Amino acid sequence: MSQLMQLKDVAESTRLGPLSGEVSAGEILHLVGPNGAGKSTLLARMAGLTSGEGSIRFGGAPLEAWATATLAQHRAYLAQQQNPPFAMPVWHYLTLHQPDKTRTGQLNEVADMLGLGDKLGRSVNQLSGGEWQRVRLAAVVLQIHPDANPVGQLLLLDEPMNSLDVAQQNALDRVLHHLCQAGIAIVMSSHDLNHTLRHAHKAWLLKRGKLIACGRREEVFTPSYLAQAYGLRFRRLDVEGHPMLISAT
């Protein structure tokens, strides 16, 4: 996999770093750690929305050198929380995020994959929390979807599984896997260690803004590293051929 983003000594006040790492094209990277670990701060920095110490290079150029409009064509970012902007149909909100607004078939396909096919005519300010979360997810997927955006490269997601039930989480995993196979790099924060163990290629484990471990998920999710991050003992079990972590305390 080719390197897409390089972080070197990235830091922000007392909330983050300094930390260094790389993101490769076509990989799923999970940011994990307890609340206050710096995951949201790091994602916002990687999205180019904040500045601070250290440097980030994206696509071979300094992140701060990218024009805002051009950057939005290459990367999409889902904030942890966002209220509906104002009353508009779901289909209209999604269209605003499409590089090619004539691709109605693609809009319908992504909406169907996330269980939104029957909600396209609803107003965004009349949706439940889970419905609005899926609309937001569909929007950022459409923004960088390679079928309509040949320069889409990176998808940054801050706790995308919030408000989603098990079936909806599974549907999102399928969408992300499809994007990954198409070469899109996906960086997302997660609180579900077993989900990360099952679906991520790599993981960065953080605590209080510091990077405890990074690498392949199996290398990061060791009892020693997890104890450092969470202050708990963990056991790793094998359940029907799949590894599973449980707290041992």
UniProtKB/Swiss-Prot annotation:
Instruction: Name one molecular function that GO assigns to this entry.
Output: ATP binding
Reaction(s) this enzyme catalyzes, per UniProt:
an R-cob(III)alamin(out) + ATP + H2O = an R-cob(III)alamin(in) + ADP + phosphate + H(+)
Q: Which CDD domains match?
A: ABC_Iron-Siderophores_B12_Hemin
GO cellular component term of the entry, any: plasma membrane
Q: What is its main location?
A: membrane
Which residues take part in binding ATP? 33-40
InterPro entries per the UniProt record, alphabetical: AAA+_ATPase, ABC_transporter-like_ATP-bd, ABC_transporter-like_CS, ABC_transptr_BtuD, Metal_Ion_Import_ABC, P-loop_NTPase
Q: Where is the ABC transporter domain?
A: 1-233
Q: Mind listing the UniProt keywords for this protein, alphabetically?
A: ATP-binding, Cell inner membrane, Cell membrane, Membrane, Nucleotide-binding, Translocase, Transport
Q: Give the UniProt family note.
A: Belongs to the ABC transporter superfamily. Vitamin B12 importer (TC 3.A.1.13.1) family.
Q: How does it assemble?
A: The complex is composed of two ATP-binding proteins (BtuD), two transmembrane proteins (BtuC) and a solute-binding protein (BtuF).
Q: What is this protein called?
A: Vitamin B12 import ATP-binding protein BtuD
